A protein has these predicted regions:
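Polybasic, glycine- and aromatic-enriched phosphate-binding surface used to engage nucleic acids
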Residues: 21, 46, 53-56, 163-284
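Signature of N6-adenine DNA methyltransferases within the class I
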Residues: 3-196, 268-272, 281
């Protein structure tokens, strides 16, 4: 589109970018080298956001429907830093089952390439989770100053004013944070071709393929996997897969509750997990 870029770029970019796709090594290397927002979470939609901005003219606008995890997840700080330098116009946090075959929370993001001023206000709306929608009508948006998110911890995009006030209060009164007494890690990601029905070396360990529920666990150990650099993502040390810890599902259940349970078994897991280390006695 040489004519378009001669005029500075597109007026608008819209789409539903892919997410959750497994990347080959050469694809991952390409994205890391060409996109500043990509991080330890190799979600392709991150690159689509950056690409949309690069395709726009300075006054242009883009809108995507994408997962909502980037608004607060620890692996998306680069993306939040990037998007907060652009003028965010609207964020709509959508209800369950927008995509019937995908169990994932999504939102609609509308933003422009323009640089926001100190007084710029973002319109946000959080749908009740069980609402059924077929179109987006007039909504009672909340107004949040975009620079408010520059002052939240890790620049999290909190979409409700009452939640912002609550977090501000908790910060001021000095409540202890859970991160002061525990460490949280993400499990492993790898090509399932690395699984083996038997251990081939002493670096192979049982791979958890069961289910994590609220306070209970269904352990299914069929395969083994080697804890090595062959894994696409892993903690640096194997100790995180041993001893007392809490396994956490990445997605909350439909009642907006964390799904987590205790285990002390040695096994390699994919879910998030946390280990508590504190001078205060903690019984798991």
């Amino acid at each position: 589109f040489p004519g378009v870029f001669a005029q500075g770029g597109f007026d608008a970019v819209i789409g539903n970018p892919p997410y959750g796709a497994f990347l080959a090594t050469d694809e991952e290397k390409y994205l890391v080298n060409h996109y500043e927002t990509i991080s330890s979470f190799r979600d392709v939609y991150i690159c689509f956001i950056e690409k949309a901005v690069n395709l726009l003219k300075q006054s242009g606008t883009f809108s995507y429907i994408i997962p909502s995890g980037w608004t607060g997840g620890p692996g998306y700080i680069k993306l939040r830093n990037f998007i907060l330098t652009k003028k965010i116009r609207k964020i709509l946090l959508l209800p369950f089952d927008i995509f019937s075959e995908a169990y994932i929370d999504t939102l609609v993001l509308v933003a422009s390439k323009a640089i926001p001023n100190d007084n710029h206000v973002v319109e946000t709306y959080v749908y009740p989770k069980k609402t059924k929608i077929s179109e987006i009508r007039e909504l009672a948006y909340q107004s949040i100053a975009q620079n408010t998110w520059l002052r939240t911890e890790d620049k999290k995009l909190i979409l409700k004013n009452d939640s912002i006030l609550l977090l501000t209060h908790l910060t001021q009164v000095g409540y202890s944070k859970i991160k002061n007494i525990c460490d949280m890690k993400r499990g492993v990601l790898f090509d399932k071709k690395l699984l083996s029905p038997t251990p081939l070396t002493n670096q192979y360990h049982p791979y958890f393929e069961g289910d994590v529920y609220r306070y209970s666990i269904n352990i299914r150990l069929v395969n083994w996997v080697e804890f090595s650099d062959k894994l696409r993502e892993k903690p640096k040390e194997f100790k995180w897969f041993q001893g007392d810890r809490i396994l956490l599902r990445r997605l909350v259940n439909r009642r907006q509750r964390l799904m987590g349970c205790f285990t002390d078994k040695t096994l390699i897991t994919q879910p998030f997990f946390c280990k508590f280390e504190s001078e205060i006695p903690i019984v798991l």
